Each structure stands twice: as C-alpha cells, then as structure tokens.
Design a protein with these regions (language model features):
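N-terminal Rossmann-fold NAD(P) dinucleotide-binding loop
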Residues: 142-143
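Glycine-rich Rossmann-fold phosphate-binding loop(s) that bind the pyrophosphate
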Residues: 138-139
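Short helix-loop-beta connector
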Residues: 126-132, 154, 215-216
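Adenosine-phosphate binding glycine-rich loop
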Residues: 11, 229-320
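Rossmann-like adenosine-cofactor binding region
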Residues: 181-262, 267
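NAD(P)-binding Rossmann-fold cofactor-contacting core
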Residues: 152-178
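N-terminal ligand-binding/catalytic initiation module
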Residues: 4-111, 119, 129, 275, ...
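Conserved beta-strand elements of the Class I
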Residues: 133-134, 295
Length: 320
C-alpha cells in the first residue's frame, strides 16, 4: 500500500505522550547503542550566520529496525526576538523500504527524549527513596526532565533556581499546576541543591552554575553544556563522584565541556568514567550500590534515542 507521510507537530506529540512508555523505549535504544547494535555517528556541527549552528545526526539500528535523521538549529540571538533558540526536526524512514514515514517537530521531541534519558539514568542511579529534586535552569528542557524523574521516583518536593528569579517563579507555578507538587524557588543554585537527593542542571551556562560540593547519596543529571567550551558543573564534582555515567563514551569526551574541561585540567581521565548508561540497563555494569555514593550522569543526547522516540510517536498516531 501507499505510505502517506505524516507531519507530527508539538501538540499532537503532547497528546500522544505517555512518559512511562517512552522511558522503556529509550532504555531499549540506549542498550542497543552500548551493545554496538546501532550506527550512530558523532554529530556534524555546521556553523552559519556567525553564532548559529546546524547539527545533523543520522542514526539507525538493525536490532531495533529503525532508521532516521535528526537536525537541530541553534540560534542564540532568537531569544531577543521572542523565538526559540533551538529548533529542529526528526525524519523517520521505513526500515524495509527507506520511504519517509514521518517528519516530527524536533523541539518537543527533544524535550521528551532529554527528559526520558535522564529519567532512565535516575531510575538506575538515584537512591530508591529520593524525595527532593533540585532543578537548576527553568528553560524548555527542565519541564521534560521533571516529568521523567517524577515517573521513576516518588518525589515530594522540587527546588528551582535560575539566573532570572522571575523566570524561576513563573516556571515553578507552571510545574505546581501541571504536577500538583510542592515547588520552592531559590535565589542561589547552591541553596537549591543543598538538601536535594537528585539534582538536574539544564542551563545554557558557559561557567559552572553551583560551587558547593555534592552531598553523599546525591545523583546529578547534568544536561546543559552541549558544546566543548561550555561548562555547567564545577570540575571538582568529578572528583567527588563515585560513578560518572554517560550515554556514549566516544561522544561525551568529544562534545561537552563538562568532561573536556576537567580532562584538560588533569582532573578527569577517561578511565574515571564508570560506564555507558546502556551497560547498566543490560546488567553488564552496576548502577547505584550504596546510599552514600555520589553518582553523576552527563547527558549530551544520542540520535538513536531521538529516532526511537519518533517511532514511538508515529506508532501511537497510527494506532489512534
């Protein structure tokens, strides 16, 4: 039969989304990646119009029967025009024929997969009884991260800190309304993380956003700093961490200043990285072992995950 190519916009994705289902799909993709059952090249970054970046990320898997392409445009000046700084799309192709099945709005999908990846990390690395979640950053990614972490742990209260207090206040109200949970806003990131069991940093910062040492038992999801010169978490955190986990050993050391900068400073070596997240999912490596451990998950995204999330939305749309 004929394939009718579908465009799946943000609104449709939001209606189709069940975060618990997405988390399970994302686990499959992360595991397949770590078992070398995907082809996920390092992303291409093409500069244009001075500060803008065009990122191109193909990925496929014979194991998962998926093939697709993600594109992202990063345009920092857009915020001044009231436009999104990050836009993009995911193209999902048919594994048998290569025909284009669907083009999906990449903004919402990125928010979902970013959240889901850290949700998976939190599931395996945070304390079972974690109650307090601290989020540094009140941007687009933060909401997806909160939704995914609430799916894997019984969080009772959320702390928010952001560069702009007003933005943090507005974001907090949005989170209260949406998830019916207690949310407190802090002026300083250090105060926000001091009593937290789980910390998420999701900012566009070039410099570390907190200075305090992480307490025993904390799990950190570091999600910002997607460029080699961006550092969101202090180098010292790498020394405190008992386990540092990444999506891709290869990509992590290439793509983020959170690892590149401490590496250049001689603080972090490659053998200090505990494992890829996929190896913990498969049981090849262990996750959290004690209540006292400090665990760090550094996320830069992985195109095979975007493609599996695209497939999830496409399948749900076809079913409905």
């Amino acid at each position: 039969g004929f394939i009718i190519m579908k465009y799946i916009d943000e609104q449709t994705q939001a209606q189709l989304l069940n975060m618990n289902e997405v988390i399970l799909e994302v686990e499959k993709a992360l595991q397949a990646f770590s078992e070398n059952k995907t082809i996920t090249p390092l992303r291409y970054v093409l500069p244009f119009n001075e500060q803008n970046r065009y990122l191109v990320m193909p990925a496929l898997s014979d194991e998962l029967n998926i093939v697709g392409l993600k594109t992202v445009s990063f345009a920092p000046e857009n915020s001044k025009k009231g436009k999104a700084t990050i836009t993009g799309s995911v193209i999902l192709s048919d594994y048998e024929t290569g025909e284009t099945l669907s083009i999906l709005d990449g903004g919402f999908l990125t928010k979902v997969r970013t959240g889901a990846i850290s949700g998976v990390a939190t599931k395996y690395l945070a304390k079972e009884n974690a109650k307090t979640l601290s989020v540094i950053g009140a941007g687009v990614q933060a909401e997806g991260l909160i939704e995914a972490i609430l799916a894997v742990r019984d969080i009772e209260k959320i702390h928010i800190a952001s560069r702009t207090f007003e933005k943090a206040e507005n974001f907090a109200q949005n989170i209260r309304n949406r998830f019916n949970i207690k949310v407190s806003v802090f002026r300083s990131a250090d105060e926000a993380i001091d009593s937290a069991d789980i910390v998420v940093t999701a900012t566009n910062a070039n410099q570390p956003v907190y200075t305090h040492s992480l307490h025993p038992g904390v799990h950190l999801n570091a999600v910002g700093s997607f460029k080699p010169d961006m550092q969101e978490i202090p180098s010292e955190t790498m020394l405190v961490a008992n386990k540092i986990v990444v999506e891709s050993m290869e990509a992590a050391l290439e793509e983020t200043g959170d690892l590149k900068i401490p590496q250049a400073e001689g603080i972090l070596t490659k053998n200090m990285l505990h494992s890829e997240l996929g190896d913990i999912i498969s049981g090849e490596k262990v996750g959290r072992e004690t209540e006292e451990e400090v665990t760090v998950f550094k996320s830069v995204g992985l195109a095979i995950v975007d493609i599996i999330v695209a497939q999830y939305f496409y399948k749900k749309l076809i079913q409905s």
